[in-house]
C-alpha cells in the first residue's frame, strides 16, 4: 500500500530538475505533440484539410483518430521574429484574454523545479513595462480588448508578441484569436501546449 503513495515516493526521491534540452524529455504527454497521418477526417476546427495538419488550429480533441496520431515531436511552434538581445535575460508578461486556464497552468509549470525556466534566464514579470515579451492566452474577448491594447502599448522595444495555444492564435473552438495572426512574432501550438514545447519556443524566440 505504502509503495503506491506517490507523494511518499516523491519525498524519498526528491525534486530533480530535468536536463532538457541537453537530454530528451523525461516524460511527455503524447497528445500535445505533432500529429501525423493521412486522409480527410472530420475536424471541428478545420485543423486537418486535404490531409494536412495545422498545429495552430488543433485542439487535440482526438476526433481524427485513428487516421492521425501523435508521434512525440514537441516542436510545434512558429517563430517569425526572434530577438537575440534577450539571450541573457528574458522577462515574460502573461496575459489572459479569456482562456480556460489550461494554457495558464502549463505556462506556470515552466517555473516549477522540474523545468526551472530560470536556468535559461527566463523570468515572469507582473507589469508590461518591464516585459521583453507578452504571452497571450485565450481567444478574443470584448472585455479584454482595451486591457490588451494598453499592455502592448506599455511595453518598451524591442519586444515580442507570443500566442500560447490554439485559442490565442486562431480562436480554437471559441471564435477568433486574441490578435490578428500576423501580429504574433511567435505562435506556440497546443491545447494546451506542454512545458517542453513552451521552453523550446522561448529559446528559439531569442535566437538560441
What residues fall within each predicted segment?
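Cofactor-cradling patches in redox/metallo enzymes
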Residues: 105-107, 112-115, 121-200
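Ferredoxin-type iron-sulfur electron-transfer modules and their immediate structural context
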Residues: 1-46
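Intrinsically disordered, low-complexity segments enriched in small residues
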Residues: 86-93, 97-100, 167-170, 183-184, ...
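Flanking helices and flexible, charged tails adjoining ferredoxin-like Fe-S electron-transfer domains
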Residues: 3, 20-21, 25-26, 60-132
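Catalytic cores of enzyme domains
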Residues: 1-7, 15-17, 189-208
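Ferredoxin-type iron-sulfur electron-transfer modules in oxidoreductases and energy-metabolism complexes
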Residues: 46, 154-157, 205
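Iron-sulfur cluster-binding cysteine motifs and their immediate structural context
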Residues: 30, 36-78
Amino acid at each position: 500500500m505504502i509503495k503506491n503513495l506517490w507523494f511518499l515516493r516523491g519525498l524519498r526521491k526528491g525534486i530533480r530538475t530535468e536536463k532538457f534540452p541537453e537530454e530528451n524529455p523525461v516524460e511527455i504527454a503524447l497528445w500535445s505533440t505533432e500529429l501525423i497521418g493521412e486522409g480527410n477526417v472530420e475536424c471541428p476546427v478545420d485543423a486537418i484539410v486535404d490531409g494536412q495538419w495545422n498545429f495552430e488550429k488543433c485542439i487535440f480533441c482526438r476526433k481524427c483518430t485513428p487516421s492521425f496520431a501523435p508521434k512525440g515531436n514537441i516542436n510545434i511552434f512558429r517563430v517569425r521574429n526572434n530577438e537575440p538581445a534577450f539571450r541573457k535575460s528574458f522577462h515574460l508578461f502573461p496575459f489572459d484574454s479569456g482562456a480556460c486556464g489550461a494554457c495558464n497552468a502549463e505556462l506556470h509549470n515552466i517555473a516549477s523545479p522540474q523545468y526551472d525556466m530560470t536556468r535559461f534566464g527566463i523570468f515572469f514579470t507582473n507589469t508590461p513595462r518591464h516585459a521583453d515579451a507578452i504571452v497571450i492566452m485565450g481567444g478574443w474577448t470584448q472585455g479584454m480588448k482595451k486591457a490588451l491594447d494598453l499592455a502592448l502599448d506599455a511595453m518598451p522595444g524591442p519586444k515580442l508578441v507570443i500566442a500560447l495555444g490554439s485559442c490565442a492564435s486562431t480562436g480554437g473552438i471559441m471564435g477568433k484569436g486574441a490578435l490578428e495572426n500576423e501580429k504574433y512574432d511567435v505562435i506556440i501550438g497546443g491545447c494546451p501546449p506542454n512545458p517542453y514545447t513552451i521552453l523550446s519556443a522561448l529559446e528559439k524566440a531569442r535566437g538560441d
